[in-house]
Amino acid sequence: MNIHEYQAKALLREFGVPVSRGVPVLKASEAEAAAETLGGPVWVVKSQIHAGGRGKGKFKEASAGDKGGVRLAKSIDEVKQFASQMLGATLVTVQTGPAGKQVNRLYIEEGSDIDKEFYLSALVDRETSRVAFVVSTEGGVNIEDVAHTSPEKIVSFSVDPATGVMSHHGRTVAKALGLRGDLGKQAEKLVAQLYNAFIAKDMALLEINPLVVTRQGELRVLDAKVSFDDNALYRHPDAVALRDESEEDAKEIEASRFDLSYVALDGQIGCMVNGAGLAMATMDIIKLYGMSPANFLDVGGGATKDKVAAAFKIITADPNVKGILVNIFGGIMKCDVIAEGVVAAVKQVGLNVPLVVRLEGTNVDAGKKIIRESGLNVLPADDLDDAAQKIVKAVKG
């Protein structure tokens, strides 16, 4: 689960992390009071959306002006002007796609006198099963681009959970960033604070880009992105309260209500599969035959008829879906339950695109019989390869 920048900074402030002062606003009329509270003489007006690249982004509406989603204001009048232009407008960035995202919140922040910019993040390293830090002298840019063009400028290390963060971890960061003396000590302290926040709040990602050195010789977090581990949210009702569903895909929200593992993608073939491994294999073979999946959807091993029906409705609600592939290998999951759910959903919402169903495993004959006797226009498949070829052919016509 992601949260907004201003929420992330408020959370980090609780752990002593040095962040700039700021005030979130939901209405343009609140901008003046926010700016006066901060005092100036320079303010930064930041769009709050769950996507990166805001500064280089562009608004769709001409009324929002030709500047990006992060703007420097040198007067309170400019703060008010930018707030009026940006709130309610649609910001398009490299991460939003062409549709963009509507800006419903702004963060008015005090300006910083920046000397240097760095990159620093903490994340879960799946290879070592530890929290890892990633550090780079290239701040304020996309870290993936740095990894591609200048990998030697990235330093990473993991933290042993038995010891937790230690002073040498902070010194590693300081050395990687060329920070000495008091700034080196600040880096040591910051790494410990970030690690403590990461562990205490069960984060999946904590990204600071950029981390800056001000001309006053202070380390400061200028931008922060926090993502929580969804599986640990039950332990953090305070984090759940920060959720902004308007920033999330409506289909993913609906899927979460039925405990379905669903991720929206950009393709045209909807997929309903049981098991993450089989789901990924299904997506791969669709790509192999020349098309792209519209989603990742794992119904799990113990799905009920209602859960399967909900999954099917979520897929059909996507206007980009031009065909659907149901691929089930029944172990704990029974093929007849899948069949009943699919039939029930189709009868409720209709079927306007080709549907290919491949069933194998527990109660497969009963499942195939339910599909066959339903009267629905369903293309049966004998195996995964056959299913993929049939749905691609049906969609391409």
Swiss-Prot record:
Top-level enzyme category: ligase
**In its keyword annotation, does this UniProt entry include Transcription regulation?**
no
Q: Which reaction(s) does the protein catalyse, per the Swiss-Prot or TrEMBL entry?
A: succinate + ATP + CoA = succinyl-CoA + ADP + phosphate; GTP + succinate + CoA = succinyl-CoA + GDP + phosphate
Residue ranges annotated for the ATP-grasp domain, each copy included: 9-254
- Output the Gene Ontology cellular-component terms: cytosol; succinate-CoA ligase complex
Q: Which HAMAP family match?
A: Succ_CoA_beta
The protein's name in its UniProt record: Succinate--CoA ligase [ADP-forming] subunit beta
Organism, by scientific name, is: Nitrobacter hamburgensis (strain DSM 10229 / NCIMB 13809 / X14)
| Lineage summary | Bacteria, Pseudomonadati, Pseudomonadota, Alphaproteobacteria, Hyphomicrobiales
This protein's gene is called sucC
